């Protein structure tokens, strides 16, 4: 097996834990919406995970006695997942970069996400041009699609 093949396999089998996500993204509590990323194929695709807990501040007002995760935060989690793999694909020695969320298209929300759910963000790259990326994302809980959208982001270069 060539060194190039080994490197490609490593990229496909790679995973990013919360400590690495914190090193890649500038987002912090309470606005960090991804806990782990797996099944990474360079910047082409991945699956991010978010453990939804009742302790998150948005549940205090959305909605009292009927906690539902705001859809915009689900979409934000998709964008953060895509941004993290873009930065990760640029190289392991990168410091946190600013990722600007540029577009949201074709967003659909299928069912509520509640405390105790584990969100899976299935992201697939649609296009890349210079420092901009576009992804199609599906958010799933228990294999069921709960939201979907196309998102575009730009990584600010220093």
UniProtKB/Swiss-Prot annotation:
Q: Which domain of life is it from?
A: Bacteria
The family line of this record is: Belongs to the thioester dehydratase family. FabZ subfamily.
What is an annotated GO biological process for this record, any one? lipid A biosynthetic process
Principal place of residence: cytoplasm
Kindly give the CDD domains that the UniProt entry links to this protein.
Answer: FabZ
Q: Name one GO molecular function term.
A: (3R)-hydroxyacyl-[acyl-carrier-protein] dehydratase activity
Q: Under which name does UniProt file this protein? A: 3-hydroxyacyl-[acyl-carrier-protein] dehydratase FabZ
> What InterPro entries does the annotation carry?
FabA_FabZ, FabZ, HotDog_dom_sf
Catalytic activity reads: a (3R)-hydroxyacyl-[ACP] = a (2E)-enoyl-[ACP] + H2O
Active site positions? 62
Q: Which GO terms describe its cellular component?
A: cytoplasm; membrane
The EC number(s) attached to this protein equal: 4.2.1.59
Q: Which keywords belong to this entry?
A: Cytoplasm, Lipid A biosynthesis, Lipid biosynthesis, Lipid metabolism, Lyase
Disulfide cysteine pairs (residue numbers): none
Q: In its keyword annotation, does this UniProt entry include Repressor?
A: no
Q: Subcellular localization, per the record? A: Cytoplasm
What does this gene product do? Answer: Involved in unsaturated fatty acids biosynthesis. Catalyzes the dehydration of short chain beta-hydroxyacyl-ACPs and long chain saturated and unsaturated beta-hydroxyacyl-ACPs.
